[in-house]
């Protein structure tokens, strides 16, 4: 019997990247999946890719906005209703973008900060009450929550706020047997980094700050999410750890690397 057999995992923003890779690993260990995303086409592609690797996996799809309160509430309940339980919630929704803080207007700054909080808060708010037998909530933070990087002020502010939300939630929900943790990816090829990750000047300078000498990919991050979701991390809560090739050891590149 697989270690997650019988468990239900609700994954928000599940149509690509880190979420898709994490869903695949959860399914491989026996979890049934309930995937929420904005695009039916991309959700279908995610399902097909998972089934290529895990034939027979139980996968339920729900098209909707993972930043919309009614949608997340409805989806969390639907995930629970599949088998009368909700064991794992994975929140991956984020908003990228770059630019100096003094060039941001209030609306843009607010959108970027809340784009890294809104869906994750909703996942917590409506997922946790359905975890009646305890469970694990895992979020995707960022090394930007710990390392000041010029040009990522709005993004960093949102991720830093997420880190404190995780700590408070872990304290509040621990007595109910619900753990809340996060991974902090370094610079990773993902939807939120497509605007700049292939710029040679930026990546070459950034890689000087990465001891392992390469950018991340989704398959680097997913095993950490799988670990935090499963029983192997049963005595961990309120934590966040870096999967970053060692970037946090050396810190940010000098100068305005993310002002493109």
List where the protein language model places each region:
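Conserved glycine-rich cofactor-binding loop
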Residues: 8, 15-16
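Substrate-binding pocket helix/loop in short-chain dehydrogenase/reductase
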Residues: 100-101, 105-113, 206
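Active-site helix of classical SDR
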Residues: 124, 158, 166
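Alpha-helical segment proximal to the catalytic Tyr-Lys
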Residues: 129-130, 171-172, 234
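Residue(s) in the substrate-gating loop at a strand-loop-helix junction
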Residues: 142
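Short, small/polar-rich loop/turn modules that mediate ligand/substrate recognition or access, typified
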Residues: 174, 179, 236-238
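Short C-terminal tail/terminal secondary-structure segment
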Residues: 226, 237-260
């Amino acid at each position: 019997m697989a270690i997650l057999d019988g468990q239900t995992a609700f994954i928000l923003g599940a149509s690509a990247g880190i979420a898709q890779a994490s869903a695949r690993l959860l399914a491989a260990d026996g979890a049934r999946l309930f995937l929420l995303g904005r695009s039916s086409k991309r959700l279908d592609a995610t399902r097909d890719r998972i089934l290529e690797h895990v034939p027979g996996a139980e996968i339920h799809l729900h098209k909707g906005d993972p930043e919309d309160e009614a949608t997340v509430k409805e989806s969390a309940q639907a995930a629970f209703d599949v088998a009368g339980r909700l064991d794992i919630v994975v929140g991956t929704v984020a908003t990228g973008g770059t630019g100096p803080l003094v060039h941001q207007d209030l609306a843009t700054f607010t959108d970027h900060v809340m784009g890294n909080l809104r869906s994750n808060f909703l996942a917590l708010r409506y997922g946790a009450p359905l975890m009646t037998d305890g469970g694990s909530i895992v979020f995707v933070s960022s090394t930007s929550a710990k390392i000041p990087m010029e040009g990522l002020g709005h993004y960093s502010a949102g991720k830093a706020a997420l880190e404190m939300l995780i700590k408070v939630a872990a304290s509040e929900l621990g007595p109910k047997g619900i753990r809340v943790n996060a991974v902090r990816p370094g610079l990773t090829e993902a939807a939120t980094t497509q605007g700049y990750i292939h710029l040679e000047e930026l990546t070459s300078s950034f890689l000087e700050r990465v001891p392992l000498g390469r950018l991340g990919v989704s398959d680097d991050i997913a095993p950490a999410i799988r670990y935090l979701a499963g029983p192997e991390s049963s005595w961990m809560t309120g934590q966040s750890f870096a999967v970053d090739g060692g970037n946090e050891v050396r810190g940010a590149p000098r100068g305005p690397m993310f002002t493109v």
